[in-house]
């Protein structure tokens, strides 16, 4: 079999880089949703992926303002740096922020806080907020390289009237043809970063000069080991009597609820350092630092079936 010959670009021919192709794809998806749906929302935690999502969404509609709100499902167990970054970005860009509070659901008796982690309770709060605000599409920052359940999910991911996902009943998705059809009460989760990797995210952050919470970069803080993970000492995450606290240089690869988010030992204090570190990593960020994904082999898929991000 003869290999197909790919002609070199003609002099002066415009050619997009890998990062710009990913950016163009994501912006196309965001604009498609804005045109097709009545009440979209962007899920925004203040973490690196949702910050990149917000950056892309603002680019998609500039110089106009973002035509939909952003929503944070707030467990109440947050890193202070992440919340301050969230509030600053929302204020700087004139974006409407909807905060869906897990604490409100606990106080109202809709969920029971059995501790220590509130991460499993987010699903109820997320689905309530989608229902109350009548959102018919929700942008998420999930990527296929993060975890195997996310690897098989469509860019336009259908959710039934209960917010549930059925991985065996996913719609065909050919090239850039997306199916957003749904009935009243149903909605679509949309993942414009599906084809990005952690490396791509950091390369884009560097190329665009995007500001992140300081905890993504190396810093010294007290930590302790638990179940093979480094956890930060925090008012919501305290060591047990047999767990030794020590100080070391760490950074966070992913950020979520304090009680289930681990850090990694690192001296990478710049975007360039992190890109170099990511290039040689053999563990996904969630596999290395998220306790909520270690519940079982199918932990993420089980939660997504129930309506998780």
Curated annotation (Swiss-Prot):
| Known EC number | 2.7.7.4
Asked whether the UniProt record includes Transferase among its keywords, one would answer yes
Q: Could you confirm whether the keyword Nucleotide-binding appears in this record?
A: yes
Catalytic reaction(s) noted: sulfate + ATP + H(+) = adenosine 5'-phosphosulfate + diphosphate
- Please, one GO biological process term? hydrogen sulfide biosynthetic process
An example of a Pfam family matching this protein is PAPS_reduct
Annotated Gene Ontology MF terms? Answer: ATP binding; sulfate adenylyltransferase (ATP) activity
Cited InterPro entries: PAPS_reduct_dom, Rossmann-like_a/b/a_fold, SO4_adenylTrfase_ssu, Sulfate_adenylyltrnsfr_sub2
Recite the UniProt keywords alphabetically. Answer: ATP-binding, Nucleotide-binding, Nucleotidyltransferase, Transferase
Pathway terms, separated by semicolons = Sulfur metabolism; hydrogen sulfide biosynthesis; sulfite from sulfate: step 1/3
Q: How does it assemble?
A: Heterodimer composed of CysD, the smaller subunit, and CysN.
Q: Which family does it belong to?
A: Belongs to the PAPS reductase family. CysD subfamily.
Q: Which PANTHER family match?
A: SULFATE ADENYLYLTRANSFERASE SUBUNIT 2
Sum up the protein's function in the record's words: With CysN forms the ATP sulfurylase (ATPS) that catalyzes the adenylation of sulfate producing adenosine 5'-phosphosulfate (APS) and diphosphate, the first enzymatic step in sulfur assimilation pathway. APS synthesis involves the formation of a high-energy phosphoric-sulfuric acid anhydride bond driven by GTP hydrolysis by CysN coupled to ATP hydrolysis by CysD.
Name the chain's protein: Sulfate adenylyltransferase subunit 2
| Gene name, Swiss-Prot/TrEMBL | cysD
């Amino acid at each position: 079999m003869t290999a197909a010959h790919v002609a070199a670009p003609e002099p002066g021919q415009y050619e997009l880089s890998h990062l710009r192709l990913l950016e163009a794809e994501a912006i196309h998806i965001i604009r498609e949703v804005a045109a097709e749906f009545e009440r979209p929302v962007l899920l925004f935690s203040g973490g690196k992926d949702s910050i990149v999502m917000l950056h892309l969404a603002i680019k998609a509609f500039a110089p106009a303002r973002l035509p939909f709100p952003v929503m944070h499902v707030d467990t109440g167990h947050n890193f202070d740096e992440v919340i301050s970054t969230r509030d600053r970005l929302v204020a700087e860009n004139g974006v409407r922020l909807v905060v869906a509070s897990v604490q409100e659901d606990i106080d109202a008796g809709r969920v029971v806080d059995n501790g220590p982690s509130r991460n499993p309770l987010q699903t109820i709060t997320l689905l309530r907020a989608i229902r109350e605000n009548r959102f018919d599409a929700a942008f998420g920052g999930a990527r296929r390289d993060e975890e195997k359940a996310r690897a098989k999910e469509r860019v336009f991911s259908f959710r039934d009237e209960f917010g549930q996902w059925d991985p065996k009943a996913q719609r065909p998705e050919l090239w850039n043809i997306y199916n957003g059809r749904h009935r009243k009460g149903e909605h679509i989760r949309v993942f414009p970063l599906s084809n990005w990797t952690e490396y791509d995210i950091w390369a884009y952050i560097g190329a665009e000069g995007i500001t992140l919470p300081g905890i993504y970069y190396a810093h010294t803080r007290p930590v302790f080991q638990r179940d093979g993970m480094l956890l930060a000492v925090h008012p919501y995450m305290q060591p047990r009597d047999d767990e030794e606290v020590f100080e070391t240089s760490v950074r966070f690869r992913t950020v979520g609820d304090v009680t289930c988010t681990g850090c990694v030992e690192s001296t990478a204090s710049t975007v360039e350092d992190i890109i170099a570190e990511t290039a040689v990593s053999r563990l996904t960020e969630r596999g290395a630092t998220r306790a909520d994904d270690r519940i079982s082999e199918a932990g993420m898929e089980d939660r997504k079936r129930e309506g998780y991000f």
